[in-house]
Each structure stands twice: as C-alpha cells, then as structure tokens.
C-alpha cells in the first residue's frame, strides 16, 4: 500500500490528472480521487517498481545462498532457497520487462520529449526505428545545430513506432518536432511549438495576476474575464517560466545511456535466472564455484 501511494504521487507529478487549478488558493486541487489513484501511468509504475523489487530480492537470495555453497555450509538449505528465488526472480524479471513496455507507451503518450531523449531521436518520422545500440555524437549540443546525433548506431526497424503508438507505421515526433510543432496530433489538432506554449504560459501567468488583482479590488467582472483566460491557458502555466526552448530538452546522453543500461540489466537478470535454474536442476551447482562468484557479484 505504501508503494502504491508513493508511485501514485510520482505518476501524478509526471502526468497530473484528476485535478483543477484553483486561482483563489493558487493550488492544484484534486477533483477526481479515482482518476489520480488509478491513472494508467501510476498502475504501470507500481507493477514495474514492485516487480523490480522482487528481482532485487531474488538476486540477493541467490547470491547469499551461493555464498553458503562457496563456504560449503548449509548446502540443502542453500539449494532449496536458490530454487525458490530463481523461479520468483525469473517470473518477476519477465513481467517487469512487460510492464516496462507499458511504461514506455505511457511515456510516449504523456511525455514525448522524454521518449525522444531516451532514443537520441531528433527528427520524427513514420515507422521510426528503436536504437538497440548506439554511440552519441559528443559534439551535438543543441537540437538545431545541424550535427548528426550519432557516431554509430544499430536500429530495430519500426520498433519505436510500435512501442509508442502500437502501430509500426505511426509517426513518432522527435526533439525537433516537439520544439517546432506543426505535426498532426491524434485528436485532429496540430501540435503547438515550444514557443507557442511559452507564450500561452505567459498569458496564463498574466491572467492569474490579473485575477488576483481584480479579486483584491472587488471587481468581479474583471476577475471572471481573467479566470476564463486563465482556464484556457492554465495547461501551459509552467511553460511561462521557460527562457529558452532548449531548457525543455532533457540531458540526452544521460537519458539515452541510462535507459540502455536499464534494459541490458533487465536482459541480464532474465538470462541469469535461467542459467541458475538450469544449473540447480540439471547440474551440481554446489560444486560450480565460478557460478557462486557470478551470483555474489550480481548482487551489487
């Protein structure tokens, strides 16, 4: 339960649903509890995080049990613990990968700039490929500097479109598209540019100030007009504090490489548990000291 509410709060900060901005209190106030508590982003984050915790616990149990085998102590207990932990770990690792796919889809829908940074993806296209492995160009500093994003990359064709839109032919916007806007959205509207969002944010900030001033002066008519303008632009409120559109782009190298480290570790854990299960059932794991070291070193 504690993990659920922590991750609900985290998901809300990344995709605020079930709330409205109250200009009288200058706060976002909840209007739909269940929209907050059961948002798709929160659900995905909960299962992905909890399952990842189970993977960690399983790795720890296998590693400690292999330490007992390495010391030639409590052999029966250690082997029984390894069998249970490896099965739990394998199931959790596979399910974690599945929920990770769901998290990727939610990021694509609600935080497309984060997805673009995760992929080092600057120019949108239909049937976009997913970078399986790549080396970013360290000379590329901004989205519009004209330099290639990669020195080298290996790509899985159309997989990014499949991840982001569940359609291998779908258009996925890149960093440049998200900054410049102009591409069609699924609701039939056209995406705003970052500069347009900044202007709307400034309009919202101005309307909020006008509303507070009108209320303080007792001018309800002006307050209603300002409240209407604020409501129309409040979704872009935060953009009004942005000075340069490049501030909206995350640290691409950090995001790109850390995402791949996470994916590689996920693949490693699945392979690790498969090997452990094979050895504990088909071989004499208690005599395989090299595997004891692998298991112990996997803990950190």
Predicted segments, located by residue:
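Polytopic transmembrane helical bundles with strong interfacial aromatic enrichment
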Residues: 1-300
């Amino acid at each position: 339960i504690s993990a659920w509410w922590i991750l609900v709060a985290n998901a809300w900060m990344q995709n605020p649903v079930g709330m409205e901005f109250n200009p009288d209190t200058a706060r976002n106030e909840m209007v739909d509890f269940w929209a907050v508590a059961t948002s798709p982003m929160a659900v995905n984050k909960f299962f992905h995080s909890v399952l990842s915790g189970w993977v960690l616990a399983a790795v720890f149990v296998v590693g400690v049990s292999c330490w007992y085998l390495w010391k030639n102590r409590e052999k029966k207990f250690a082997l029984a613990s390894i069998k249970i932990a490896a099965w739990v770990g394998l199931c959790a690792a596979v399910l974690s990968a599945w929920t990770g796919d769901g998290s990727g889809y939610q990021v694509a829908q609600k935080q497309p700039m984060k997805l673009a940074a995760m992929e080092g993806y600057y120019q949108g296209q239909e049937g976009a490929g997913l970078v399986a492995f790549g080396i970013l160009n360290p000379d590329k500093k901004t989205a519009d500097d004209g330099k290639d994003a990669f020195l080298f990359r290996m790509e899985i064709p159309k997989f990014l479109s499949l991840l982001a839109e569940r359609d291998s032919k779908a258009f996925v916007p890149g960093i440049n598209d998200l900054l410049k806007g102009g591409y069609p959205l699924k609701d039939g509207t056209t995406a705003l540019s970052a500069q347009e969002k900044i202007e709307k944010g400034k309009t919202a900030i101005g309307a909020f100030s006008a509303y507070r001033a009108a209320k303080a002066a007792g001018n309800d008519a002006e307050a209603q007009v300002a409240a209407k303008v604020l409501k129309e632009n409040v979704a872009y409120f935060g953009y009004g504090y942005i000075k340069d559109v490049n501030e909206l782009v995350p640290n691409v190298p950090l995001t790109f490489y850390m995402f791949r480290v996470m994916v590689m570790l996920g693949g490693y854990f699945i392979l690790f548990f498969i090997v452990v299960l094979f050895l504990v059932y088909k071989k004499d794991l208690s005599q395989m000291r090299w595997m004891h070291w692998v298991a112990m070193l996997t803990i950190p």
